[in-house]
């Protein structure tokens, strides 16, 4: 059994986070509420450097509780689709993101464009990387789609499970080198825990790959082994990507997870070495 070394226990970068602490909610705009976490914390642990990442992609956020005041003081509401580049120096800590968005609630903005530009500026500065923001107004709420992840779901495999500790070695000897395939698989059984609070994070994951055929039972056991694992969403997806590359020798690979929302936000990390994210559509559990 592989021991799960904790690279975060002494990380000074996590000590000042508001996550897991009692917090006062501010209703007037304050960009300083945003807090970033260096991506290097996790990437160092899985032997990745910013100069030689094996993937591209984005952290795709949906903010369902965006509200502000217009120039006349009338409340406005919207949904925001936000994409944060995988290459940014920091990921954005989700509780701080929620507190930051709440600070818009009693703040006047001249128009929608001012809200969008403020979000891009503040999030880019916190993440130290590229951010795009699309604001969806109420008149477009009715055309928002609920979809299923593409591919074949592996959750109905009749396996017996007794070990819930993270173990990438479930992927060892999991491929048939004589069968080279291109397929898309998915699972709704992904669960990990918040790195700071240990609250459960519920997700669905899509794995699209080309290469030796992966044993689906072993893949499902591997995904289930995240059940007691403490890491942020983005870190889990990058870990899955690296493990699949290492153990399964995928020639091409995409890992895309969509997590259920918390505090009005959902986080949907996307990592690939051959394709790019399309439109963001929520799943039924989101």
Curated annotation (Swiss-Prot):
Keywords for this protein: Cytoplasm, NADP, Oxidoreductase, Queuosine biosynthesis
GO CC aspect terms: cytosol
Main location: cytoplasm
Residue positions binding NADPH: 94-95, 262-263
Classification via Gene3D superfamilies: 3.30.1130.10
InterPro entries with a match to the protein in the record: GTP-CH-I_C/QueF (IPR043133), NADPH_dep_7-cyano-7-deazaG_red (IPR050084), QueF (IPR029500), QueF_N (IPR029139), QueF_type2 (IPR016428)
Enzyme Commission code(s) on record: 1.7.1.13
EC class (word): oxidoreductase
HAMAP family xrefs: QueF_type2
Similarity remark: Belongs to the GTP cyclohydrolase I family. QueF type 2 subfamily.
Protein function: Catalyzes the NADPH-dependent reduction of 7-cyano-7-deazaguanine (preQ0) to 7-aminomethyl-7-deazaguanine (preQ1).
Record note on quaternary structure: Homodimer.
Protein known as: NADPH-dependent 7-cyano-7-deazaguanine reductase
Gene name of the record: queF
């Amino acid at each position: 059994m592989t021991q799960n070394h904790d690279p975060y226990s002494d990380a000074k970068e996590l000590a000042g986070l508001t996550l897991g602490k009692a917090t006062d909610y501010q209703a007037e705009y304050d960009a300083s509420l945003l807090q970033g976490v260096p991506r290097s914390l996790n990437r160092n642990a899985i032997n990745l450097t910013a100069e030689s990442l094996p993937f591209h992609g984005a952290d795709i956020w949906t903010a369902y509780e965006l509200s502000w005041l217009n120039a006349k003081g009338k409340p406005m509401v919207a949904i925001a689709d936000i994409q944060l580049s995988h290459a940014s120096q920091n990921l954005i800590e989700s509780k701080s993101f929620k507190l930051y968005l709440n600070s818009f609630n009693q703040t006047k903005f001249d128009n929608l464009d001012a809200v969008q530009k403020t979000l891009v500026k503040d999030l880019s500065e916190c993440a130290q990387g590229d951010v795009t923001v699309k604001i969806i107004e109420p008149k477009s709420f009715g055309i928002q789609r609920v979809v299923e992840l593409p591919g074949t779901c592996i959750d109905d495999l009749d396996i017996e499970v007794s070990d819930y500790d993270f173990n990438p070695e479930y992927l060892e000897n999991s491929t048939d080198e004589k069968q080279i395939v291109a397929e898309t698989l998915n699972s709704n059984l992904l669960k990990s825990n918040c790195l700071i609070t240990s609250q459960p994070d519920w997700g669905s994951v899509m794995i699209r790959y080309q290469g030796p055929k992966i044993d689906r039972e072993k893949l499902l056991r591997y995904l289930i082994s995240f059940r007691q694992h403490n890491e942020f969403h983005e870190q889990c997806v990058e870990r899955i990507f690296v493990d699949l590359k290492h153990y399964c020798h995928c020639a091409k690979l995409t890992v895309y997870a969509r997590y259920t929302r918390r505090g009005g936000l959902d986080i949907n990390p996307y990592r690939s070495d051959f394709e790019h994210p399309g439109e963001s559509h929520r799943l039924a559990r989101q």
